[in-house]
Regions:
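Bacterial N-terminal signal peptides
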Residues: 2-11
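Sec/Tat signal peptide C-region and signal peptidase I cleavage site
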Residues: 12-16
Length: 218
């Protein structure tokens, strides 16, 4: 192969063999040039990212809720406000991940749900949530997935220290074209108890459809 390549090179006219000078590489902009052109200074950007990656009091607040919890949930599936709720129980295990930046909760329980025939049936419920505090958005953030669907719900919220209450808002789409706005209120009663109330937007009116009471297992 080298021989054929050399022969081919010999047949090329001499002007084609002349090599042009290598292109001059454009100098990389200095920090001052980058700032002048509107580009962030890389060193400053890395410094800011390092600061934003640090844990703070908001992460410590989430850490205080780590542990194993038993829960009792009440669900109002009937739109009639006077209807009795469906009651079920389960366990939630909440653990730290990524050195306390996030907290993952594994939920297992039994609940009554309507089957395809409309009759109530016992089913095993499994769910997983991840919560954290986003230093960039300055918001508490959460995701939720369970064995009752294939989507992942995302939410953002704030914490009111005066009432020891988290308030999250989000949206999910259980059926195509039917997006549902939700509001989730988590109130810390004490270090061993907290509650969760779930509200859904039903035709422009908010209705509470679920309430969960958590007790820390010791």
């Amino acid at each position: 192969m080298a021989l054929f390549a050399a022969a081919a090179f010999m047949t090329v006219p001499s002007f084609a063999q002349q090599t042009s000078p290598p292109p001059i590489a454009a100098p990389s902009p200095s920090g001052n040039q980058a700032a002048a052109s509107g580009q962030p200074d890389q060193a400053e950007m890395m410094k800011q990212m390092t600061e934003l990656a640090k844990l703070n009091e908001n992460h410590k607040l989430l850490a205080s809720m780590a542990g194993t919890w038993s829960y009792t949930v009440q669900m109002w599936m009937n739109p009639d406000p006077n209807a009795k709720p469906e009651v079920s129980k389960g366990t939630a295990i909440r653990k730290s991940m990524m050195n306390g930046r996030f907290f993952v909760t594994d939920v297992t329980g039994n609940m009554q749900m309507p089957g395809a025939d409309g009759k109530m049936k016992d089913m095993t419920f499994k769910g997983m949530g991840i919560e954290g505090y986003d230093n960039v958005k300055k918001k508490f953030i959460g995701t939720w997935a369970d064995n009752m669907g294939t989507s992942i719900m995302m939410s953002e919220g704030d914490y009111d220290p005066a009432t020891k209450t988290f308030t999250y808002t989000g949206e999910y789409e259980a059926i195509p074209g039917m997006k549902q706005k939700i509001r989730e209120v988590v109130k810390i009663v004490d270090k061993d108890h907290h509650t969760l109330e779930w509200y859904e937007d039903r035709g422009g009116q908010e209705a509470k459809t679920m309430e969960i009471a958590y007790t820390r297992k010791k």
